[in-house]
Amino acid sequence: MKIRASVRKICTKCQLIRRKGRIRVICSNPRHKQRQR
């Protein structure tokens, strides 16, 4: 899980999701998981 100021899709399988007011990226590749600060 990378925590970044700006999250973006890295590959085609990445999905942007809003959870509890935070923007997250979920992906089949675990290295692509991100969360906004």
UniProtKB/Swiss-Prot annotation:
Keyword Plastid: yes
Entry GO MF terms: structural constituent of ribosome
Location relative to the cell: Plastid, Chloroplast
GO CC annotations, alphabetized: chloroplast; ribonucleoprotein complex; ribosome
UniProt xrefs under InterPro entries: Ribosomal_bL36 (IPR000473), Ribosomal_bL36_sp (IPR035977)
Signal peptide: none
SUPFAM superfamilies: Ribosomal protein L36
Taxonomy, superkingdom: Eukaryota
Pfam families attached to this UniProt entry: Ribosomal_L36
Family in the record: Belongs to the bacterial ribosomal protein bL36 family.
Matches recorded under HAMAP family: Ribosomal_bL36
NCBIfam families xrefs: rpmJ_bact
Name of the protein in question: Large ribosomal subunit protein bL36c
